[in-house]
Amino acid sequence: MTEYLLLLVGTVLVNNFVLVKFLGLCPFMGVSKKLETAIGMGLATTFVLTLASVSAYLVETYILTPLGIEYLRTMSFILVIAVVVQFTEMVVHKTSPTLYRLLGIFLPLITTNCAVLGVALLNINENHNFIQSIIYGFGAAVGFSLVLILFAAMRERIAVADVPMPFKGASIAMITAGLMSLAFMGFTGLVK
């Protein structure tokens, strides 16, 4: 049980996929202008990342490895991720049309989010079992969502602040992301 808790905490805080591994930067910068959009994207990504992680594990364990076709791993995982994203898009469209409109183009772009493919591939490379795959995928998703929501809240505050002209827009966003990354470095010794 402790092993699973450490894996979860390590994935969320210590080895955050956005701030440490630099995966998922496109939605991190693109969807973080409004807090409600960031929350919606975080929830959708959490669902997709967890489900894609588990699905990739199952495809690897029960199809690719037994047939000896591990060289098709990346292509297979992209296909699995696309199916999971389409399913998520249909669910969001049915349950929350407002969120569906707010997320706009970013919902289908979860398919190309490198964090989703990165988590699936790292899961296999680190030889996680089924339970660890679920926890790793969920932890990565929670970490992504946490950082996305915190960053969106900071960007909303910065939007109304008196920022010098040369720092407005992307410049202050990158500085803020860098400071946020430094803050998360404080968790480095938490899990070994």
Swiss-Prot record:
Subcellular localization(s) per the UniProt record: Cell inner membrane
GO biological process: electron transport chain
A Pfam family this chain is assigned to: Rnf-Nqr
A single GO cellular-component term on record: plasma membrane
Topological relation to the membrane, as annotated: Multi-pass membrane protein
Keywords, ordered alphabetically: Cell inner membrane, Cell membrane, Electron transport, Membrane, Translocase, Transmembrane, Transmembrane helix, Transport
Family indicated by similarity: Belongs to the NqrDE/RnfAE family.
NCBIfam families in the record: PRK05151.1, rnfA
Record function comment: Part of a membrane-bound complex that couples electron transfer with translocation of ions across the membrane.
The protein's name in its UniProt record: Ion-translocating oxidoreductase complex subunit A
UniProt source species: Vibrio atlanticus (strain LGP32) (Vibrio splendidus (strain Mel32))
Gene: rnfA
